[in-house]
Amino acid sequence: MTPRSALIDPFSLDGQVAVVTGGTGRLGSQYARALLSAGAAVALFDVATPGPIVRELLDSDALMSSHLVDTTDRAAVDRAMDEVVTRFGAPTILINNAGLASSPADAGLATARFEHYPATAWDAMMESHLKSALLVSQAFLVTFRAAKRDAGSIINVSSTYGVVSPDQSMYERQRLGGQEWFKPVGYSVAKSGMLNFTRWLAEYCAHERLGVRVNTLVPGGVREDGHSPEFVAEYEKRTPLGRMAREDDYNGAVVFLASQASAYMTGAMLVVDGGWTAR
């Protein structure tokens, strides 16, 4: 049954419970704030401990919790999911946001030329993005079924580089002191994989009559301190809206996909990229 609050305000998440993987990072924590502001209780799953900003939010809001968990380990995911159920009840919203931008274990080689891209970096990308989404989605659905919930939403986070290939000439502006720097192939392939994972899982959940919708959020590039001024200028020149994204540019999209406002939407992708992929 649709909650009364959703009939009055289709964007309301009152009474809902959300899990956000990669939840202590810049975007993950922002997605969590958006869900909190709409009324949901939110559990953060991450291999990293919360930084000062997230810790302050955790200390001030009883509807948020943080769980130190390797989302590529099913047993660890199950334990964390049990903790969420004990504290808030069975989750109804899942944001699969975990994933590496490049493999820190391979340092410079992870952004080197394709011919020298390490297989270990490739494996790390597939594990952190796709295996994580697989395992956490499995645990989410097990819990969802057991609680006999009737309406839920899974949001898989992809990237514009899962839709179009990066223009490597832009990344010449990120190369310092002659260092080679290419946007890694593993990142693009993993983010592309999230799109078809969404379509497959959306059809499966519909076939099983679970009431769980599955969609992909496709965000554009967010400005970071590590971006060179030349890179930012080039990116913004190529973006129809003329700027890189801020973290809060995705608040509305996240709440929309999580809520009954998108009740007739599944297996789709919502692109929020300032027009980057329109060209």
What residue ranges belong to the model's regions?
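Short C-terminal tail/terminal secondary-structure segment
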Residues: T2-D9, A101, T111, K237, ...
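Amphipathic alpha-helical dimer-interface segment in Rossmann-like NAD(P)H-dependent oxidoreductases
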Residues: G99, E127-R149, Y161-S165, A202-H207, ...
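Catalytic Tyr-X3-Lys loop
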Residues: T92, L100, F114-L134, I155, ...
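Short, small/polar-rich loop/turn modules that mediate ligand/substrate recognition or access, typified
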Residues: L94, A151, A206-R213, M265-G267
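Substrate-binding pocket helix/loop in short-chain dehydrogenase/reductase
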Residues: A105-D123, Q168, Y235
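Catalytic loop of short-chain dehydrogenase/reductase
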Residues: Y117-A119, D150, I155-H207, G221
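Canonical Rossmann dinucleotide-binding motif of NAD(H)/NADP(H)-dependent dehydrogenases/reductases
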Residues: P10-A43, L201
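Conserved glycine-rich Rossmann-like NAD(P)H-binding loop of the short-chain dehydrogenase/reductase
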Residues: A38-V54
